[in-house]
Amino acid sequence: MINIEDISKSSNQSEEKQLKSTSSKPKYSFAAKSLFKGSNNITPYYLSTSNTFQCVASESIQTWLLSDDGHIFTSSGNFVLDVSSGGYFVELVQLNSNSKTQIWTIDTTNNKIQNQGNGKYLDIDNLNIYVAPLNGNATQQWTTFRRAPIPTGNWGYFQSKQLDSNNNYWGLSVLNNSTSYNTSVVMNKVQAKSIKRWSHFITFGGNLVLDIGPSINGSKTYYLNTNVYKANDLMQQWGINENNQIFNQYYPNLCIGFVGELGVDSTVNCVLAQPSSACDINFQWIANPTYSLNQIVSEVPEQFPAYTSGDLLASYQYLSDDATNGYTDDIRSLYTSINVSLENFYVNVTNATCPSSIHQLKIFQNQIKNELTYAINVRLVFDNYSGFYSKLFSQGSTNLTNLANLINVDMSSDQVVNGNYTDAITSVFYAIISEIPIGGSIIANIGESAEEFGELDAESNDSGPSTYQVTLSKLYDHLNENYENEMANAQRMKNTILQDWGMMSKTFTLCFLPTNNPSSLNMNGFDFQKISSIASLAYLTAMIQMLLPTNYQIYFTPAGYYAPVSSDDYSYTDSTGTYIMAEIDNCNSHPPKALTDKLWKNGVSKQEVFTSSYGWNLATSVTYYNMVGKYGGMFKLSFPTVKNITSVPMQFVMTNGSDRVGTFNVKTHFAGLASTYYNSGALGHHYYDIAVTDIDRNKVANFTVDNNLEALEGSYVSIKTNSLVVQPGYVVGNPTCNQGSFSQGFAASILIPIYKSN
């Protein structure tokens, strides 16, 4: 039985079990959303595979895949929607291509979902889904859409719809940029490099989350503060409803707002309280970037006004022929053509005269002029984006060669490099927003929407991240292919908009919003030179992130032991110990200053680089310099680093045979190093096990590390063949494996990245 889910509930449940994959290929994803609302008239309900809810409608349990032949699949593709044997309730089963009750018709005109087996319609009965004859009730009305994602990963923030008296935007932030728990959540002005904005309600510290603070004078209004992550705590779980209100799962009728006057009071505290109405602007928030374009192209198509017969067709054909100087009698077919001037067409339409045989030319003139105006502005937006993107990659080959020389890698070799294209381009958009928050989100809006559009438009429905493993000799070709794909995605998205009246109208509206509105596509007054400079530096950093692990790793010495540091250019020290960057096979050969200057002089965080946080993925070796005894055998060992590239805090347990080496926490977008010394055997293969769970103790992945010691050599390290088991919803990327050194006495290192599948 399938349920309608109230967004006041929460769960970590997903499909109960994985069955054999179906063979029918999904076409696109959508979420079926009922127009029926809860008793508070704020909370919407969604079609869901679970009897509880997970924060927002884009979660996997509420995302569905519609195949060309009318099957409705769960997001994983393992189950289809069917009518139960009793002919009343709806259930999830395996695909049966001969069953008509598994085939549905989505009527976007009347907002109905009809079963082809019995002719009945999807309906609601006490929050359960069933099928019933057509009855005209609102409970049979559904809107199909694909909600644009809210910011994920290590970027994005939430800003209030309320402006101050000087039209400045303000967003959720942490008092004094504190990284300590139990700190007040306040409003801060949206400005460049304000890094303590909230992202997915997990701070940049990794495990601090938004929580409910004390009540204000014993009322039902509460302060908000930061706190450590607590498993299954509904007070730390949040959702966004259709009114752009951020509600709490424990108090579903209470939403985040603020008390005080923006720009006047020295501190404006954020609170959890009851909105005065669904339109209370002090309780409405915008996720920046908004991906408003992604949302537009996900909506139900809306055709242009039809002129298909009689006088209507004759008038349209005459005007088209006149405007295009006889080129075509269907002017709309040229909206996507790059070889025509829509501006000239507009002039011709405006100056067109009406012969006696044409009776309704004026009506057509106004409609086609509007269409041309919309199309001209939409094309201009995408032309500006294409110009920015082309310039960003115009020096790609030269820049890559120069970096390779600094990092000392041979670009003609067959050495393998790991990369993630999405991470690279996302870092560019994040840099632009960080430096130019007012307006910078426009570039991110287009770029991220184009990327999402391309993924959904692809023939395959791959759920993994955009990671790749390629030889250095083929790296540039691979990057160039990614660049061309991104340009093609933007082009296809533009053409989709230009061929749809509803999408084109809505996109045109965004072109004239104020630039400080995150949904805006208004590029008037843009400083593209500044944007390009910021983007170029960000992309350069992304290329360094990709190439650096091919020749360098981090050498970690725990606090209290000697570490030979002679320059801050290649070292970092904190309370846990000293981190030194050096070549993989020589711990005494450090990166040149010309390379490190490209990092530290461009604002890159040393902590992030040396601890492999966010976009940095350097494997870490453990070494005890000039030590004897057990530490002198460090070369026999290998030490794992688990990189958590998700928004879910994790931990992993390392066991060496019957010995439990330790439990290690891994914050979101951080890396966790198992630096605890353990016993190793003699020559040959030795194994230790890694079990990764999320902070709620749900399994993520299990694997065995093979630590192979040969005579007078440092250990070779790898993941044991066939040992990797990954839970649904996660992907384990290509590990970075570096050999230890017998002569220099350092351990082997292995970094294992874990992603959330899309």
Swiss-Prot record:
GO molecular-function term, one example from the UniProt record: carbohydrate binding
Protein name, as recorded: Calcium up-regulated protein E
Similarity remark: Belongs to the cup family.
Record flagged with keyword Membrane: yes
Entry keyword set: Cytoplasm, Lectin, Membrane, Repeat
Main function: May play an important role in stabilizing and/or regulating the cell membrane during Ca(2+) stress or certain stages of development.
Record PROSITE patterns: RICIN_B_LECTIN
Source lineage: Eukaryota, Amoebozoa, Evosea, Eumycetozoa, Dictyostelia
Induction field: Induced by high levels of extracellular Ca(2+).
GO term, biological process aspect, one: response to cation stress
Keyword Nucleotidyltransferase: no
GO CC field: cytoplasm; membrane; nucleus
Domain of life from the UniProt record: Eukaryota
Residue span(s) of domain Ricin B-type lectin: 25-145, 156-288
Major site of localization recorded for this protein: cytoplasm
Region named Disordered: 1-22
Membrane topology according to the record: Peripheral membrane protein
Record localization: Cytoplasm; Membrane
PANTHER family: CALCIUM UP-REGULATED PROTEIN A-RELATED (PTHR31599:SF2)
Listed InterPro entries: Ca_Up-reg_Membrane_Reg (IPR051780), Ricin_B-like_lectins (IPR035992), Ricin_B_lectin (IPR000772)
Pfam families, alphabetized: Ricin_B_lectin (PF00652)
